[in-house]
Every structure is written in C-alpha cells, then in structure tokens.
Swiss-Prot record:
PANTHER family named among the record's database cross-references: BNACNNG10540D PROTEIN (PTHR31672), F-BOX PROTEIN CPR30-LIKE (PTHR31672:SF13)
Span of domain F-box: 29-80
Protein name according to UniProt: F-box protein At1g11270
NCBIfam families referenced in this protein's UniProt entry, alphabetically: F_box_assoc_1
GO biological process: one example: heat acclimation
C-alpha cells in the first residue's frame, strides 16, 4: 500500500509539473497569437516615458522597438495629441530638490529638473522634448528631461574665440544667442550660431556656424544672413526652420531652413520700426510663429498664417 501511495503521489506531481509546463507553453502561444508585436508596439506608444524605460528590459525585441526613432516619433505625437502641453520648471539654485518633482494640472504635467551642468542659458522652447542649454565659454549640452539622457557638443569657433578673449581678460564682446532645432527631412538635430560680424571684428555682415549632430562637427555656412540681426532677442525654432528679427528701421523676420541651410526673409514686421529692440520678441502660440511688441501697458501680437503671410 505504501509503495502504491508513493507512486501515486509521484505520479500526481509529475502530472502537475507536466500540466504546468503545458499551461506555460499554452499561455505563451496564446499571447503570441493574440498580441503580435505590431499590436504590442501600439500599446507601448500609449505609455509614459517612465514606463517605457522600465519595459526595455522585458525582451530584446521590446528594447529595440522602444529605442527606434520611428517609435519615439509616434509616441511623442500620440502624447501631444492625448493631453495638454507639459511644462518644465528649471531652477539654477543649489536647492534640495535633487530628484525633481511633478504636479498635474488638468491634462498637463509640470515637472522640475536639475540639469547636469552649471550653464544658465537655455535656447527658447524645446524641440521634440529636448532642451538645449549653453554657455559661450564651454560646451553646449542637449538634455532629455524625461529620460535624463544628455549629450555634450564640442566648442564652436565662436566659443573658442570668446574663451580665448576671456582668458586674456578682454570682455568687450556681446553674448550671442544659440538656436536649436531639427532638420525635418533627414531627422538630424542642429545648433546654430548667427551673430553680427562687426562686433567680433569680422568682415561680413553676419557670421553663421552650424553644428550637425550626425557628424558631430561645427562648420561655417556661406553665405550668411545679408541682414544684421536683433541680438537682444532669442531665435525661435518652428517647423524645420530657425527665425530671428533683423535690425534696422524696418524690422524683418529672417528664417534659416535647417535642411537647405539657406536664409530668406519671411515678411516684414510693420509695427517694429525705430523702437527699442528690447521690447520686441518672437514666440510660438498655437503652433504658429508670432512676433510681439510691448508698448507700455499694451502688447501687440502678430502671427504668421499658414500661407506665410502675416496677420494681426
């Protein structure tokens, strides 16, 4: 009886083990049958970045999908369509907020973030979630606050020149404003220095340097802008181009196409004439490039329409 009982127990354990193994195989086959990888990709697109970072360890296939550029572009578009814009609050003080905080306001998320640098200059806005922070004396840094990824760039010729003058205690040079955007045709990010040449004892009207992330190098662009720029204001990136306001009695909106690397005048800003250039600025409102003038208590805003004209 004892032997029969033992054999029956062993047999039942084997049956359970076999059933468990069969169940695992069955579940795996059902998951593969019901959730092909393209469907899994569609589900992953709906997840926040924090979850995607954790799910990269599920499998090599998931990791490859999440790290692919096409997936990241789709996930960004879906996130932008599903809720309001996120707001990033940057503090340069050495406070105790080491890990960042988040607050939810309606469909938007407000986050704090500590950048991995002491630079205090930031390019206007963001480009697909990337922030560019810079200093004229040290390398620029591009940061993704959502993933904590960052990349340092080599010094441009302008930065090397200013750093040399700083070491010699020659401080009588302006601080140009850096532009950051994306070449929408080939998908590469670029940084642009555009500055008035005479302030740096150069011959041309303006000088332009471009950093291409695909080859990790700076180079000059010829010809540069034929118009001097308003160097009080930050350049603004929009839809594959970077924009500046020009100097002069009749201010213009100057555009630099990041793929063709050519300059053109989009339009004139007829109300920005012979006024204090510090009160003029550009911004993005409702995905449109806008020009603003502050005149006492009043503020006048012009926006470019889809045909490239302007309207108030």
């Amino acid at each position: 009886m004892l032997k029969r009982d033992c054999s029956s127990v062993v047999g039942s354990e084997r049956e359970r083990d076999g059933s468990s193994l069969a169940l695992k195989r069955h579940c795996s086959s059902v998951v593969k049958l019901l959730l092909p990888h393209d469907v899994v990709g569609l589900i992953l697109e709906r997840l926040p970045v924090e979850s995607l970072l954790r799910f990269k360890c599920v499998s090599n296939q998931w990791k490859s999908t999440i790290e692919s550029q096409c997936f990241q572009e789709r996930q960004l578009i879906r996130r932008m369509e599903s809720r309001g814009p996120d707001v990033l609050v940057v503090s340069f003080a050495d406070d105790e907020d080491k890990y960042g905080r988040k607050a939810v306001f309606g469909s938007s998320i407000v986050s704090t973030f500590r950048f991995p640098t002491l630079h205090t200059l930031i390019c206007y806005g963001s480009c697909e979630g990337l922030i560019c922070i810079y200093c004229v004396y040290s390398p620029n840094i591009v940061v993704n606050p959502a993933t904590k990824w960052h990349r340092s760039c080599p010094l441009s010729n302008l930065q090397q020149f200013l750093d040399d003058k700083f070491e010699k205690k020659e401080y009588d040079f302006p601080t140009p404003k850096l532009a950051f955007g994306k070449d929408k045709l080939n998908g590469t990010y670029k940084q642009v220095w555009l500055y008035n040449s005479s302030e740096f004892r150069l011959d041309d009207v303006t000088t332009c340097e471009v950093f291409d992330f695909s080859n990790n190098a700076w180079r000059y662009v010829h010809p540069a802008s034929p118009y001097r720029i308003n160097d009080y204001q930050d350049p603004v990136y929009s839809d594959g181009s970077v924009h500046w306001l020009t100097e002069g009695k009749e201010s213009k909106i100057l555009s630099f196409h990041l793929h063709t690397e050519t300059f053109q005048v989009l339009c004139e800003a007829p109300f920005l004439r012979e006024r204090d250039p510090v009160g003029d600025s550009m911004c993005i409102l409702d995905n449109r490039l806008c020009v603003s003038e502050i005149n006492g208590p009043a503020q006048l805003i012009w926006s470019l329409d889809s045909s490239g004209g302007n309207k108030c």
